[in-house]
């Protein structure tokens, strides 16, 4: 675990919460862009029937992948790949991984990079910019 100046773990918590929110948004946006709003609504219902509310999509992404794979077969990998690539782009990083690379590892690496480098997603009005000034 990274220790921030003055032991400020609230910065880490804020970054992790924002990361998870951003990942969930990337997932929903990817499904909507690729499959349309009607299918997106069905995917949300499918996840909720399996005990995964929208707020838990990122924290339970492994389960989301299993559910999608069960429902869509191997084509679910396209949704997962596009979601992870979109997440990297949201943090202004080039997705330098292939379709068959371990996407779970790529998400974990990005999460750690976000925390260690205090990265902010492009479309997040929820992060107070003062954390970037105070902790660098």
Enumerate the language-model features and the residues they cover.
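Long, compositionally biased intrinsically disordered regulatory segments in eukaryotic proteins
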Residues: 1-136
């Amino acid at each position: 675990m990274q220790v921030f100046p003055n032991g400020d773990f609230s910065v880490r918590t804020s970054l992790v919460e924002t990361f998870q929110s951003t990942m969930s948004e990337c997932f929903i946006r990817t499904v909507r862009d690729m499959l349309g709003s009607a299918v997106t609504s069905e995917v949300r219902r499918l996840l909720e029937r399996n005990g995964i509310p929208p707020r838990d999509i990122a924290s339970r992404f492994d389960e989301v992948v299993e559910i999608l794979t069960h429902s869509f077969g191997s084509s679910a990998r396209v949704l997962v790949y596009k979601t992870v690539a979109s997440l990297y782009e949201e943090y202004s990083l080039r997705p330098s991984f292939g379709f068959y690379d371990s996407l779970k590892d790529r998400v974990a690496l990005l999460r750690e990079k976000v925390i260690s480098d205090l990265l902010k997603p492009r479309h997040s009005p929820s992060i107070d910019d003062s954390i970037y000034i105070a902790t660098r």
